[in-house]
């Protein structure tokens, strides 16, 4: 056992030494890769994801599930094998995109609203791109077609739902319709908003760190001696944004890349997965299956609507903040509503006193 540990330590030291040498020798492309990663974070990831992460945190703390109609609760349970507390989590995950669903599910698990098995199920299937990334960043910017971006969003969303139904059918026998009671904090709305922003900022910074690391690593592959097909495969498997850029002229592959998510996204949710004991192979298998389903749905839609295809080649692609204003506007609107409501509650409380 000691010899095995010694071998691992030696191998780790050698690997770190090689990486260090590569960083020195190829410092210019690595710097450019990190710079590209920062651009992706500032102009693509954070504007589309951060508002939904904040809203998700506020929703699980402030929105009660008590008034969910019984028929919706039953339909949701028999579809996904999940309690009514998970309805808002799944909706937020589908709208916010990865990794918002995993982030919110992890928070609900920590609060005791979801069991480990329920949170695990959500994290495995609620992992897709939101409409902002699919339609605007991928469709409009990369493929020059919002309609194709809509097709990408539809295929990835349907893939998530189908995957969730399959996982629900597998684990439904061990679940019950009765859900744990929601545990709401007694803090004011302004305090809830502050806490939500703080937690979302921390999660966003971790995700951006992973994006910069993978962007730097992929920059090393941009070598003239490496075949373009190898670069495309590496990008598709590793990082979703770069993978979409490389495959923007192949809608079916593009749909698969979106549903796969990339190893970078898988690393981003690793912390959440560890909380509910999700194995790496489970993520790989489920996401690979989701990618196949998404590609098949895209293939069907393109055969029904053959005119909806990207004819433009990607040339000198640069990340542009197409929808950053939407996210900022949403945050400001929610902020104003919360503080107005909180002000009314405070005034009413003071009058009663």
Which role fits each region the language model picked out?
Residues 14-29, 34-44, 50-54, 58, ...:
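Selected transmembrane alpha-helices and immediately adjacent juxtamembrane segments
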Residues 78-143, 234-247, 252-276, 285-289:
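Alpha-helical membrane segments and immediately flanking helix-loop junctions
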Residues 114-121, 131-133, 160-161, 252-345:
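C-terminal transmembrane helix pair
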Residues 64, 193, 197-262:
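Transmembrane helical segments that form the transport core of multi-pass membrane transport proteins
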Residues 106, 123-127, 131-182, 215, ...:
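Alpha-helical transmembrane segments of multi-pass small-molecule/ion transporters
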Residues 24-35, 61-65, 136-138, 218-229, ...:
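Transmembrane helix-loop junctions in multi-pass membrane proteins
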Residues 2, 63-72, 91-107, 151-155, ...:
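Hydrophobic alpha-helical transmembrane segments
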Residues 43, 48, 52, 56, ...:
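Alpha-helical transmembrane segments in multi-pass membrane proteins
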